[in-house]
UniProtKB/Swiss-Prot annotation:
It comes from Pongo abelii. Belongs to the UPF0489 family. Residues 189-200 have a biased composition (Polar residues). Residues 175-208 are annotated as: Disordered. This is UPF0489 protein C5orf22 homolog. InterPro entries: UPF0489 (IPR024131).
Length: 442
């Protein structure tokens, strides 16, 4: 856990590790910008370690790219799902590692290299990645359509909970006095069909080599130009990458440990099924040309724009004639039973919320896994064993994500305390700042 050398020369150091706790995840960004302004973080080449059940790597669809250079305006434009990429385009983050639990599979496992830049035709932020995560939101553009390009290395790595070697009948709780053995679990290959990926433990740094291993899914290396993948990544490789960078931020969403899909409780099973039909994104095949990809994105953008217009119109009036008019469009037939069902359950349906829920129903559902106490403890230990072999972060940001019901409200306080205790065990005394019920600084 020693500080990396060289790259951090010239940066100021905090006396104690600052830990910022917020409610909504985008609220951590002002603290990161504050650290850049105070010279505790560099203005560029920051590595960002992101433990979360959601990637948060979307982009405000209609936000002008230059908004990133006006931080006050920027902070007001961001939401929980799209706050990281603007910091990439601004030049601050060059390397993002998304550590995710087994139940979160939104982005193809492995190492991705792509560009983030300004779309010359729309002046918005777009990417060259062809992963379904970006295609389904209409965010892909060809490289020659981007200006002010910023390269991004994105590593997507699964963290699996360890299993105690002890007999659990004799050990109802994890004992801090006993050192758990981290055992690798067999897992299905979560990479794309043309990725060779295997399950293997990430190697520890040679200076701290142990017989126990952190449970991480081996990753594969992918790029938008070449979709061939090679098995890669070890804690040693992560360590070397962090040493090359100037500094890194450790970011933890408490829903990493236990997560809900709040929309599943807002809608009936049949309503949710209809939303999936209306908003579905059919995964494209492989070996697509640039022209194919552009056509796919254009079609998807038109689909989403039509759906947005539909539900915006229904906000003004959901009489039968209006519903039938929209339902007459291709692929919109199921709008009629959806509206009928909503109106039976509520006097005035919130069609804006219906549209927001629909946007999450593209090629996969939002992750939903309410963890047991034991599962939470196992994940805490896996994260602990990963972090103990990495350099110290410059700062830590934590999002509770409970008011919007992503992290279960009856578990969030317990998870937060476990995470803070883990951080204290790793880094000693913390400079803890809790802003969960307040507005973050500007």
């Amino acid at each position: 856990m020693s500080d990396s050398a060289g790259g951090r020369a010239g940066l100021r150091r905090y006396p104690k590790l600052p830990v910022w706790v917020v409610e909504d995840h985008q609220e951590v960004l002002p603290f990161i910008y504050r650290a850049i302004g105070s010279k505790h973080l560099p203005a560029s080449n920051i590595s960002f370690l992101h433990f979360d059940s959601h990637p948060d790597l979307l982009i405000p669809v209609n936000m002008p790219a230059d908004t990133v250079f006006d931080k006050e305006t920027l902070f007001g434009e961001l939401s929980i799902e799209n706050w990281i990429m603007p910091a990439v385009y601004a030049g601050h983050f060059s390397h993002v590692i998304w550590f995710h639990p087994a139940w979160a599979q939104q982005i193809r496992e492995g190492r991705h290299h792509f560009l983030v830049g300004k779309d010359t035709s729309t002046t918005t932020i777009r990417v060259t990645s062809t992963d379904h995560y970006f295609l389904s939101d209409g965010l892909y553009v060809p490289e020659d359509q981007l200006e002010n390009q910023k390269p991004l290395q994105l590593d997507v790595i699964m963290v699996k909970p360890y299993k105690l070697c002890n007999n659990q009948e004799e050990n109802d709780a994890v004992s801090s006095a006993k050192k758990p053995k981290l055992a690798l679990e067999d897992s299905r290959n979560t990479a794309s069909t043309n990725c060779d990926s295997s399950s293997e433990g990430l190697e520890k740094d040679t200076a701290t080599q142990r017989s126990d291993q952190t449970c991480l899914e081996a990753s594969c290396s992918c790029s938008s130009e070449n979709q061939e993948c090679q098995t890669a990544a070890s804690t040693g490789e992560i360590l070397e990458t962090l040493k090359k960078g100037k500094a890194f931020v450790l970011d933890i969403d408490l829903d990493f440990f236990s997560v809900k899909n709040p929309f599943k409780e807002m809608f009936t099973q049949e309503e949710y099924k209809i939303l999936q039909e209306l908003y579905q994104f059919k995964k494209p095949g492989t070996n697509l040309t640039e022209e194919d990809l552009v056509d796919i994105v254009d079609t998807r953008i038109h689909q989403l724009e039509d759906l947005e217009a539909t539900f915006a119109d229904l906000c003004d009036g959901d009489d039968e004639e209006t519903v039938q008019r929209w339902a007459s469009n291709p692929g919109m037939e199921s709008l009629v039973p959806l509206v009928q069902s909503l109106k039976k359950r509520m006097e005035v349906p919130d069609y804006e919320m219906v549209h927001q829920a629909g946007l999450t129903c593209d090629y996969s559902e939002l992750p939903h896994h309410i963890s047991t106490e034991q599962e939470i403890e196992y994940l805490i230990q896996s994260v602990h064993y990963l972090l103990k072999n990495l350099p110290n972060p410059t700062l830590v940001t934590i999002a509770r994500s409970s008011l919007d019901d992503y992290c279960p409200s009856d578990q969030v306080d317990t998870i937060q305390e476990k995470v803070l205790n883990m951080l204290r065990a790793l880094y000693g005394n913390l400079d803890l700042q809790v802003y969960a019920a307040e507005s973050p600084p500007s």
